[in-house]
Amino acid sequence: SYSPDRYGHQPFAGDDLTQPNEPYWAHVDRVFKEAGRLGFLLLVAPAYLGADKDGYVDLLKKAGPPRCREYGLWIGKRYRALRNILWVHGGDRNPWDVKDEVRALAQAIREVDEQHLHTAHWANGTAAFDTFGDEGWLDVNSSYTYGPVAWRILADRQGVPPRPTFLIESH
């Protein structure tokens, strides 16, 4: 599940990724524009998976890869002109049960938005490249640990070829 915006608007009509609710997304547009004006880089999760039932997992499962791809094309086109975003796929859990859906979404965004970088955020003790490291759409590694940070970052930098790595979540 997911929360409405502060005005009570849900992101999608009828829990359908392919039916964006324009008032919700107009609010997102205003927030993104203001963040850009202030010089913020936004880490944008187009479909936050959630630590438990607080994310989009059920919605992605219901949609399946074809509808996730359609949503990815839509959101990628909508925000490709912005200069201040980094796409972050996943969020607080491993994507095993929605791996094909996450892949379809990410590849679709990349198809229409070649300028922005992509990373992913999985469960504690993992890095983005642990799941999709060999796929062309994943540009930047991110590490998530509540353990020793230096060890995790050094381990994650050992990939071939080496790619940039940053700490996305810790204590």
Q: Over which residues does each language-model region extend?
A:
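Short, conserved loop/helix-junction motifs that constitute active-site signature segments
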Residues: D134, R157-V160
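Active-site mouth of glycoside hydrolases
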Residues: S1-W151
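Hydrophobic helix-cap positions at the C-terminus of alpha-helices
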Residues: Y79, D156-R157
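Short beta-strand/loop segments at the ligand-binding rim of alpha/beta enzyme cores
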Residues: I109-T119, V160-H171
